[in-house]
UniProtKB/Swiss-Prot annotation:
Pfam families named among the record's database cross-references: Methyltransf_11
Assembly notes: Exists probably as a trimer.
E.C. number: 2.1.1.315
Organism: Amycolatopsis mediterranei (strain S699) (Nocardia mediterranei)
Lineage of the species this protein comes from: Bacteria, Bacillati, Actinomycetota, Actinomycetes, Pseudonocardiales
Activity regulation annotation text: Slightly inhibited by Ca(2+) and Mg(2+). Strongly inhibited by Zn(2+), Ni(2+) and Co(2+).
Protein function: Catalyzes the methylation of 27-O-demethylrifamycin SV (DMRSV) to rifamycin SV.
InterPro entries: Erg6_SMT_methyltransf, MeTfrase_dom, Methyltransf_11, SAM-dependent_MTases_sf
Identification of the protein by name: 27-O-demethylrifamycin SV methyltransferase
């Protein structure tokens, strides 16, 4: 299945912005459940905090958020760590909403959101202390190219922080696992093993640092999303055909039962 172009992805997010907000809440990414009673909104915030906690953020650091969504993670980090954040998205509606959110949070003096394509970052070399990509790289036509772009705009000593889907090996072997995930996801989610991921980081000139497999804590996201999506059937059918609704709902449920579809939090450092 051919991956959608960045322009198609951006238009898709524009078209379904309201529905996505109802589905995921403030954060358009998975949640982290170390407490089974946590709501989806609480769990997604915990995942943001979990990845941010893997970084030595300092006041005044410049951070680039690739795939900023509605801007909540960027605003949260700016508020908690006094960093300067530039967030980018290929969804004009997300950029508009994120800037409005930053204004209302009174952080628009240090948080700005721009329309930009991560495949061709419009920033000079060595211009950021941190590049952050929380669950956005799987949308990219070539995630390894984006990582090379991230390495380019990082300053020496800067760090890349990622949250991404991971291929968790089973006795069937990686090739069989990858094929099964591809079949379930129909090209929506492409995954590789941790070893392959870290090899690509090294090829981009980055030194892998921390890697935390959080699959068991993020897996409930699929079940929660399926439950909430089912409850949004009436609203969803205003945007998509009934057949597509059932395909999407079925995919959420299939992902929740697929043991080889995992989730990893990674950091890597650009050498001095």
């Amino acid at each position: 299945m051919t991956k959608p172009t960045p322009n198609e992805i951006g238009k898709g997010y524009d078209a379904f912005a309201d529905l996505l907000d109802q589905l995921w809440g403030e954060n358009l990414h998975h949640g982290y459940w170390d407490d089974e009673s946590a709501t989806l909104e609480e769990a997604t915030t915990r995942l943001t905090d979990r990845l941010a906690g893997m970084l030595p953020l300092r006041a005044g650091d410049r951070l680039l958020d690739i795939g900023c969504g509605n801007g909540e993670p960027a605003i949260r980090m700016a508020t908690a760590n006094d960093v300067m954040v530039t967030g980018i998205s290929i969804s004009e509606k997300q950029v508009e909403r994120a800037n409005d959110r930053a204004y209302k949070a009174d952080v628009d003096d240090r948080v700005v959101f721009e329309y930009a394509d991560a495949m061709e970052l419009p920033y000079p070399d060595a211009s950021f202390d941190v590049v952050w990509a929380l669950e956005s790289l799987h949308h990219m036509p070539d995630r390894w190219h984006v990582i090379r772009q991230a390495a380019r705009v990082l300053r020496p000593g800067g760090r890349l922080a990622l949250g991404d889907f991971l291929l968790v090996p089973s006795p069937a072997g990686l090739e069989a696992d990858a094929e099964r995930v591809r079949e379930v996801g129909k090209g929506v989610v492409a995954v590789v093993s941790l070893d392959e991921y870290q090899a690509h980081l090294r090829e981009a000139g980055l030194e892998p640092e921390s890697a935390e497999d959080v699959s068991q804590y993020t897996r409930p996201s699929w079940t929660k999303a399926a439950e909430r999506f089912e409850g949004l059937r009436e609203q969803a059918l205003q945007h998509i055909e009934a057949a597509q609704f059932e395909v999407t709902l079925g995919r959420f449920r299939a992902f929740s039962e697929e043991p080889s579809l995992g989730y990893v939090l990674l950091t890597a450092r650009k050498p001095d």
